[in-house]
From Swiss-Prot:
Gene3D superfamilies: Dihydrodipicolinate Reductase, domain 2, NAD(P)-binding Rossmann-like Domain. Its main location: plastid. The keyword Chloroplast applies. NADP(+) binds at R76, I77, D100, R145, N381. D-glyceraldehyde 3-phosphate binds at S217, C218, T219, T248, R263, T276, G277, R299. This is Glyceraldehyde-3-phosphate dehydrogenase A, chloroplastic. The record marks H245 as: Activates thiol group during catalysis. Tetramer of either four A chains (GAPDH 2) or two A and two B chains (GAPDH 1). It holds the Pfam family Gp_dh_C. It is found in: Plastid, Chloroplast. PANTHER family: GLYCERALDEHYDE-3-PHOSPHATE DEHYDROGENASE 2 (PTHR43148). It comes from the Eukaryota.
């Protein structure tokens, strides 16, 4: 192909492996008992929190005990995680407790009614003053800002889903271990030497010896799978990324003080340029790309769904249709359920509650000359990310020793 030509993909209006809400969190619980009164519910809380075990073993294919899971921080990711987990069949996880400073009434209400996800199609209610019930599944609620004080040891907690965004280094996350938990999964980029795993990219490297792990960021989970495909098929020399990202709770509703002067400005009124470590973090899961990628974020006035714009120089000459074909092949095989390719002319809201980590917008794939590739990928930065947190927690459970 001539070096001054621009190649743009020609979509055939098909959607490959779209994966919208397969695990929508709207399925009913498979627990073998009905809804009961508050006395029975509290008795069940006592049974759950004092049950022996947590380690999983299998005999003739029957799971003898599930991994006992605590959620620390019941915000956007914490509640999305619970909905995603609730929608899974035969999960190896058992969520038994939530640490939430808002208390039982708030935890129950915000789980049931969500401005983005809609009303949870489950029977959600308080169970006394120290638990909530989700389709008869009783989950204890505790409240303490210091993880060291949490009752993880007494409750036999195997895995903590660390969803506050605060305890992201070894010292902070390690407080859960001090409290008696056996492992911690951080739902944010980890700091220091904490192992980082992105499902579909490097999760096979996880071993039971890891006590604290990170699921990386939502943007890294979107970027890494298709970057892996690009590098394997065409060889990435260098590149830059921009994520046009929905605003988050870290921003201000109206102008107010913030350590980042741009994030101090009203989130719903501005396009806010800010930093992101997502591109550099790809090197944590794909070490051969260290130093080859960088990027920024543009926070925009939408509440959910974001989109990555990646431009890379590649070593192998190519054209847009060939790039999309590589994505389709991976989406149908090793990255099935992680990556998808969409040929429809859609907009951000159409990707709300998408289960996959990233959806390639094939009509926007471009190749300038024959070695500069531009790829656009959509992702639900809450729901899709939370599905991967559940996936990684499942891997922890399945590799339990």
């Amino acid at each position: 192909m001539a070096s001054n030509m621009l190649s743009i993909a020609n979509p055939s209006l098909r959607v490959y492996n779209k994966g919208f809400s397969e695990f929508s969190g709207l399925h009913t619980s498979s627990l073998p008992f009905g809804r009961k009164g508050s006395d029975d519910l509290m008795a069940f809380v006592s049974f759950q929190t004092n049950a022996v075990g947590g380690k999983r073993s299998s005999q003739n294919g029957v799971v003898e005990a599930k991994l006992k899971v605590a959620i620390n921080g019941f915000g956007r990711i914490g509640r999305n995680f619970l909905r995603c987990w609730h929608g899974r069949k035969d999960s190896p996880l058992d969520v038994v407790v939530i640490n939430d400073t808002g208390g039982v009434k708030q935890a129950s209400h915000l789980l049931k009614y969500d401005s983005i996800l809609g009303t949870f199609d489950a029977d959600v209610k308080t169970a006394g003053d120290s638990a909530i019930s989700v389709d008869g599944k009783v989950i204890k609620v505790v409240s303490d800002r210091n993880p060291v004080n949490l009752p993880w040891g007494d409750m036999g907690i195997d895995l903590v889903i660390e969803g506050t965004g605060v305890f992201v280094d070894r010292d902070g996350a390690g407080k859960h271990l001090q409290a008696g938990a056996k492992k911690v999964l951080i739902t944010a980029p980890g700091k220091g030497d904490i192992p980082t795993y992105v499902v579909g990219v490097n999760e096979e490297g996880y071993t039971h010896a890891d006590t604290i792990i990170s699921n990386a960021s939502c943007t890294t989970n979107c970027l890494a799978p298709f970057v892996k495909v690009l590098d394997q098929k065409f060889g990435i020399i260098k590149g830059t990324m921009t994520t046009t990202h929905s605003y988050t709770g870290d921003q201000r509703l109206l102008d107010a003080s913030h350590r980042d002067l741009r994030r101090a400005r009203a989130a719903c009124l501005n396009i806010v340029p800010t930093s992101t470590g997502a591109a550099k973090a790809v090197a944590l899961v794909l070490p051969n790309l260290k130093g080859k990628l960088n990027g920024i974020a543009l926070r925009v006035p939408t509440p959910n769904v974001s989109v990555v714009d990646l431009v890379v120089q590649v070593s192998k000459k190519t054209f847009a249709e060939e790039v999309n074909a590589a994505f389709r092949e991976s989406a149908d095989n090793e990255l099935k359920g992680i990556l998808s390719v969409c040929d429809e002319p859609l907009v951000s809201i159409d990707f709300r509650c998408t289960d996959v980590s990233s959806t390639i917008d094939s009509s926007l794939t471009m190749v300038m000359g024959d070695d500069m590739v531009k790829v656009i990928a959509w992702y639900d930065n809450e729901w899709g990310y939370s599905q991967r947190v559940v996936d990684l927690a499942d891997i922890v459970a399945n590799k339990w020793q």
